[in-house]
Amino acid sequence: MCGIVGYIGDKQATPILLEGLTRLEYRGYDSAGIAILHNGNINIKKAKGRLNVLRELVEKDYMEGTIGIGHTRWATHGEPSDTNSHPHLSQSGLIAVVHNGIIENYLPLKKWLIEEGYNFISETDTEVVANLLEYYYNGDIVEALRKVLDRIEGSYALGVLCKDNPDMIVAARKEAPLIVGIGNGENFIASDIPAILKYTRNVYFLDDHEIAIIKKDSVEFIDVFGRKIGKSLFEVKWDVEAAEKGGYEHFMIKEIHEQPAAIKDTLRGRIINDSQIVLDNINITKEDLEKIEKIFIVACGTAYHAGVVGKYVIESFARIPVEVDVASEFRYRNPIVNERILTIVISQSGETADTIAALKEAKRKGSRVIAITNVVGSSVSREADEVLYTWAGPEIAVASTKAYTTQLIALYLIALDFALKKGTMSSTKVVEIISELKKLPDKVQYLLDNKEVIQKFASEHYNVKDVFYIGRGLDYAVAMEGSLKLKEISYIHSEAYPAGELKHGTLALVEEGTLIIALATQDDLFEKMLSNIKEVKARGGYVVAFAKQGNLQLEGVVDKVIYIPDTLKELTPVLTVVPLQLLAYYMAVEKGCDVDKPRNLAKSVTVE
């Protein structure tokens, strides 16, 4: 969840580092800092709070130098404070370190270093790394880093400066993202591509247990044993402008409006003759599918909600049992996984720590793993056996929108491919579903073009204290996502419930004026859903229902009906979620919330 940037070249490092950290704000942070190596000294400025606080410090006392490292911190060890902010210096000031991850054995290492005469000024695990590097340093910072990596346990992306080596940055990673950017007479390190995209499109992705030695005109990669490694250079295709707001007030609303294009891009090239599916490099045969006894879908947050939809459609289309698991729970319950289990992991960033851990656990137990991710070269994409990319483009807002809808598209494609190969769906039905899939971008655009009704409703109801989302079947899956969107960016208490469960306890919370969002798009469940709606209306609930165009049965029953374009029931989540995203957004705007960077949250959760 922290952000790392490093620069070495002929330009002043400070503005490049500050700009790079700005590009990483979406990852979430509570403090920031930079370290500049100049004239044999390492100068550090760091502060709790937003990057503007750090900028003010730098403006008062500018930091000269052409080599430096920067960091945005999300507290894990030690509260947010100036002292706990990164970069951290070793005791003598010889070495500066920035770190993303968690050093699990930092306490015994800290105790040992104290016994060796080292003092600590922060509560962080990162200062342990800095002092450990100094302890092992004997004129060779790379050798010292190798020895440190042999001692520390846990996850890390590290950027290191040593004032005895003013011509290099050294970096290493294990289970935390880190890239190396290649420029012309200048090179970079970063947690994510947007931080350096203004300066270079050519990057290397560090893998676990690798060390990078970065000079201004060369980069060398070695493993923890000191052996040289050859790596492939990756060219970033998307533009830096894709990570800008493009005239919208917030990234979130921009990304909501990008969904028609993102859906088209994710479908592009994967449908042949309107009747066949091509899943990139995924080659699961009919024989493979016959051996699969069960599918696990494993993910976190919004991606988990997409996985719940995936369960419905894979079971419906391909008739394979599916279990959806929260990644942070998956590996700790010793799941029954073997070579007859297929695991599908979903992660927008491809760097979600819990999802990566679950992926590795599934592979260790013999499962074949397919990853659905939005980031080429991410950890998830490299660890999985096969990958299906969602071509959503960079998603900057913490609250995920276009990544969710493209994850749904990816799951529909997988379900259709499996159904075709297993013969569980007629070719006529497949053609019908594919035809409707191709219509979704225009139908999403229709919802966006008619967003004023949502905006007006939000302006009238943003002061509510509680909102309950209810639905059945696929509508319940979407209700969970709608509820999450509302609570995470507007800070309004919200919960989602299966409508049939209301009478088992939740109905006690409904009183006069309680806002109920009722999703009623599933034709085969509509009558039961109508009964549930009447239950909450009878208790005084203010009900806003979402239904398909042409269904007039809710008129006069609920307080307000919002219509979505008609489509096949399996595809309704892609449409129903859009007005729910808009509702959350406009509620948050009305309340004056920080929409793109909600409190206490981060875009990419890279610690467990």
Swiss-Prot record:
- Write down the EC number: 2.6.1.16
Compartments reported by the entry:
Cytoplasm
Keyword Phosphoprotein included in the entry's annotation: no
List, in alphabetical order, the GO biological process terms annotated in this UniProt record: carbohydrate metabolic process; fructose 6-phosphate metabolic process; protein N-linked glycosylation; UDP-N-acetylglucosamine metabolic process
**Top-level division of the source organism's lineage:** Bacteria
Q: Which InterPro entries does this one have?
A: GATase_2_dom, GFAT, GFAT_N, GlmS/AgaS_SIS, GlmS/FrlB_SIS, Ntn_hydrolases_N, SIS_dom, SIS_dom_sf
Catalysed reactions, as listed in the record: D-fructose 6-phosphate + L-glutamine = D-glucosamine 6-phosphate + L-glutamate
Q: Does the keyword Nucleotide-binding apply?
A: no
Active site per database record: C2, K603
Please provide the record's keywords in A-Z order: Aminotransferase, Cytoplasm, Glutamine amidotransferase, Repeat, Transferase
Predominant subcellular localization, coarse grouping: cytoplasm
Looking at the record, the residues that make up the Glutamine amidotransferase type-2 domain are 2-217
Q: Which residues form the SIS domain?
A: 285-424, 453-598
Any one Pfam family match given in the protein's UniProt record, by short name: GATase_6
A Gene Ontology CC term for this entry?
cytosol
Which GO terms label this protein's molecular function in UniProt? carbohydrate derivative binding; glutamine-fructose-6-phosphate transaminase (isomerizing) activity
CDD domains according to UniProt: GFAT (cd00714), SIS_GlmS_GlmD_1 (cd05008), SIS_GlmS_GlmD_2 (cd05009)
Function statement: Catalyzes the first step in hexosamine metabolism, converting fructose-6P into glucosamine-6P using glutamine as a nitrogen source.
Q: How does it assemble?
A: Homodimer.
Sorted alphabetically, which HAMAP family does this protein's record hold? GlmS
Please identify the protein, giving its name as recorded: Glutamine--fructose-6-phosphate aminotransferase [isomerizing]
Per the UniProt record, the lineage of the source organism begins with: Bacteria, Bacillati, Bacillota, Clostridia, Thermoanaerobacterales
